[in-house]
C-alpha cells in the first residue's frame, strides 16, 4: 500500500495498515431512510448506535481507502491528495480507540460523540482539497483519457462514500448530543419526516435569487406547480434530508438563473423559471425548466465531469464558495440524488433552454443508501486499458465527392 507506508513515518499511524486490510474485507451495510428514522425515534438507543457505528464507519472508511490506492501514482503523489489520505487514516484510528470500549459506560458514549464531531470537522474541506489535487495533477501532467476515466469513476464513489459517512455521523451527533434543534424541533437528526418539497424549492430559489440580483441586478421569477397523483388537494411531503434537497436545487437554480439572465441581457422581461413537483407511486420528481439558451448535446456529460471544469481556479483568501471555482456543483448534486437511489438528469435544447429533473424515491422504505464497495469488480475497472473505438470517427473535413479526381 504505497501511500500508507509513507504515512508510517509518523509512529502514531503505524497501526493503520492492519485495520484497513481487516475492515476492507467487509461490505458496507446500507440503511434505508426508514431505518435512519428508527435509529432516531423516541426510543432511540445511543448504545445501539455506538455499537453499530464503531463497526460500520471503519468499514466505509477502509473500503474507500483501499480504492484510492488504485489511482495513478501521479495523482497519489500530489500534496493535496496525500493530505486527504492522512485525514482518512487519522479518522480511522480515532474510531479504533472505541473498538473495545464498554457501551454501558456513559463517559465512553460522550467521548465517542466528541470524536465523531472532531472527525466531521477534520473532513470539512475534503471536497475542495481533493479537487485541488486533481488540478495539481492536470497542471503537471496534462490530460490522459485513461487516467481521466479512472479519476471520474473514483471521485463519484469517493464523494458518495463521504456523503454516507457524514450522514451517519450527523445522525448520531444531532440525536445524542443532548440538545434539540430549536429551528427544526421535529427533525430526526438531519431528516425531516414531513419535508414540504415546495418550501425547500422556495428556500433554494430565494438564496439563488439573492446571488443573482447581487451580480446581475436582475433575476427571473419562479413559477411552481404541484401534481400529487394520490391526493390532488394535499401538498407534497416526503421523508428526506432537506439539506441534501436544498443543495441540489440551489445548484440548479444558480445555473438556470445565470443562463437566463445572460441569454436575455437585452430583454426588459426575463422568462420565469418553472418548477414542477410530481408525486407518483414510486417516484417524486422535480423538474426545473429554464429558457436560458440550452447546451449542445455533446457538452451535457462534460457538465458532470470533474476533469472538464470551465470555471476559473479559486484563489486562496478570495472568499466566496470554494466549490464554485472547481465546477463540482452538478456532479456533487447528482451524487446527493443518487445517494438514496434517485438521480439527476439534464435535458437540453440548444437555442431554447434546459430541463433539469431530480428523481427521488417516494417511499422511505425504497430510499436505501447507495454505497461503493471495494471488490474485484471495482479493482478491474482501474485496470481497464482504453482500446480503439469500434465506430467510425468522422473527420473534421469530410471528403469532397462533388468532383471526380483521377488518383
From Swiss-Prot:
Which molecular-function annotation in GO is an example for this chain? protein kinase activity
Activity regulation:
Activity is enhanced by binding to the pyruvate dehydrogenase subunit DLAT. Inhibited by ADP and pyruvate; these compounds interfere with DLAT binding and thereby inhibit kinase activity. Inhibited by dichloroacetate. Inhibited by AZD7545; this compound interferes with DLAT binding and thereby inhibits kinase activity.
Q: Which family does it belong to?
A: Belongs to the PDK/BCKDK protein kinase family.
Cite the binding residues for ATP: 251-258, 290, 309-310, 325-330
Location in the cell reads: Mitochondrion matrix
Going by the UniProt record, its keywords in alphabetical order are: ATP-binding, Kinase, Mitochondrion, Nucleotide-binding, Phosphoprotein, Transferase, Transit peptide
Broad class of the protein's primary localization: mitochondrion
In-chain residues carrying the UniProt-annotated modification N6-succinyllysine? 376
Question: Which positions carry the signal peptide feature in this UniProt record?
Answer: none
* Name the record gives this protein: [Pyruvate dehydrogenase (acetyl-transferring)] kinase isozyme 2, mitochondrial
Q: Does Nucleotide-binding count among this protein's keywords?
A: yes
The EC designation for this entry is 2.7.11.2
Under InterPro entries, the record lists: AK/P_DHK_N_sf, BCDHK/PDK_N, BCKD/PDK, HATPase_C_sf, His_kinase_dom
The function of this protein is:
Kinase that plays a key role in the regulation of glucose and fatty acid metabolism and homeostasis via phosphorylation of the pyruvate dehydrogenase subunits PDHA1 and PDHA2. This inhibits pyruvate dehydrogenase activity, and thereby regulates metabolite flux through the tricarboxylic acid cycle, down-regulates aerobic respiration and inhibits the formation of acetyl-coenzyme A from pyruvate. Inhibition of pyruvate dehydrogenase decreases glucose utilization and increases fat metabolism. Mediates cellular responses to insulin.
Instruction: Tell me the Pfam families matching this sequence.
Output: BCDHK_Adom3, HATPase_c
- Enzymatic reactions: L-seryl-[pyruvate dehydrogenase E1 alpha subunit] + ATP = O-phospho-L-seryl-[pyruvate dehydrogenase E1 alpha subunit] + ADP + H(+)
Q: What induces it?
A: Down-regulated by insulin. Up-regulated by reactive oxygen species and cigarette smoke extract. Up-regulated by PPARD.
Source organism per entry reads: Homo sapiens (Human)
Q: Give the domain of life.
A: Eukaryota
Its subunit composition reads: Homodimer, and heterodimer with PDK1. Interacts with the pyruvate dehydrogenase complex subunit DLAT, and is part of the multimeric pyruvate dehydrogenase complex that contains multiple copies of pyruvate dehydrogenase (E1), dihydrolipoamide acetyltransferase (DLAT, E2) and lipoamide dehydrogenase (DLD, E3).
Q: Where is the Histidine kinase domain?
A: 135-364
Could you tell me which SUPFAM superfamilies the record lists for this protein? alpha-ketoacid dehydrogenase kinase, N-terminal domain (SSF69012), ATPase domain of HSP90 chaperone/DNA topoisomerase II/histidine kinase (SSF55874)
Annotated Gene Ontology cellular components are: cytosol; mitochondrial matrix; mitochondrion; nucleoplasm; pyruvate dehydrogenase complex
Modified residue annotations for Phosphotyrosine: 215-216
Tissue-specific expression: Expressed in many tissues, with the highest level in heart and skeletal muscle, intermediate levels in brain, kidney, pancreas and liver, and low levels in placenta and lung.
Amino acid at each position: 500500500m504505497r501511500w500508507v507506508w509513507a504515512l508510517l513515518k509518523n509512529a502514531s499511524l503505524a497501526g493503520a495498515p492492519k485495520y484497513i486490510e481487516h475492515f476492507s474485507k467487509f461490505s458496507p451495510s446500507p440503511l434505508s431512510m426508514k431505518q435512519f428514522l428508527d435509529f432516531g425515534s423516541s426510543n432511540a438507543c445511543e448504545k445501539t448506535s455506538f455499537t453499530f457505528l464503531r463497526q460500520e464507519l471503519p468499514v466505509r472508511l477502509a473500503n474507500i481507502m483501499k480504492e484510492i490506492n488504485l489511482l495513478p501514482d501521479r495523482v497519489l503523489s500530489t500534496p493535496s491528495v496525500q493530505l486527504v489520505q492522512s485525514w482518512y487514516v487519522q479518522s480511522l484510528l480515532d474510531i479504533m480507540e472505541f473498538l473495545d470500549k464498554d457501551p454501558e459506560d456513559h463517559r465512553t458514549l460522550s467521548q465517542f460523540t466528541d470524536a465523531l464531531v472532531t472527525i466531521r470537522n477534520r473532513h470539512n474541506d475534503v471536497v475542495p482539497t481533493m479537487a485541488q489535487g486533481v488540478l495539481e495533477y492536470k497542471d503537471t501532467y496534462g490530460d490522459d483519457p485513461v487516467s481521466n476515466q479512472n479519476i471520474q469513476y473514483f471521485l463519484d464513489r469517493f464523494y458518495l462514500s463521504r456523503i454516507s459517512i457524514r450522514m451517519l455521523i450527523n445522525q448520531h451527533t444531532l440525536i445524542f448530543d443532548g440538545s434539540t434543534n430549536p429551528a427544526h424541533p421535529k427533525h430526526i437528526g438531519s431528516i425531516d419526516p414531513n419535508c414540504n418539497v415546495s418550501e425547500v424549492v422556495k428556500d433554494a430559489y430565494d438564496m439563488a435569487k439573492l446571488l443573482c440580483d447581487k451580480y446581475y441586478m436582475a433575476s427571473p421569477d419562479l413559477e411552481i406547480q404541484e401534481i400529487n397523483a394520490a391526493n390532488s388537494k394535499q401538498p407534497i411531503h416526503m421523508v428526506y434530508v432537506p439539506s441534501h434537497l436544498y443543495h441540489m436545487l440551489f445548484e440548479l437554480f444558480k445555473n438556470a438563473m445565470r443562463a437566463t439572465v445572460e441569454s436575455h441581457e437585452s430583454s426588459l422581461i426575463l422568462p420565469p423559471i418553472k418548477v414542477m413537483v410530481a408525486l407518483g407511486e414510486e417516484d417524486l420528481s422535480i423538474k426545473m425548466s429554464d429558457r436560458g439558451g440550452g447546451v449542445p448535446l455533446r457538452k451535457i456529460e462534460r457538465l458532470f465531469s470533474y476533469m472538464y471544469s470551465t470555471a476559473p481556479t479559486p484563489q486562496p483568501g478570495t472568499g466566496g464558495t470554494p466549490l464554485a471555482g472547481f465546477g463540482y456543483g452538478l456532479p456533487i448534486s447528482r451524487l446527493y440524488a443518487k445517494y438514496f437511489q434517485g438521480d439527476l438528469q439534464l435535458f437540453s435544447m440548444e437555442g431554447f433552454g434546459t430541463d433539469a429533473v431530480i428523481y427521488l424515491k417516494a417511499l422511505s422504505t425504497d430510499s436505501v443508501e447507495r454505497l461503493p464497495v471495494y471488490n474485484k469488480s471495482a479493482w478491474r475497472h482501474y485496470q481497464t486499458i482504453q482500446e480503439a473505438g469500434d465506430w467510425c470517427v468522422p473527420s473534421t473535413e469530410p471528403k469532397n465527392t462533388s468532383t471526380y479526381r483521377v488518383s
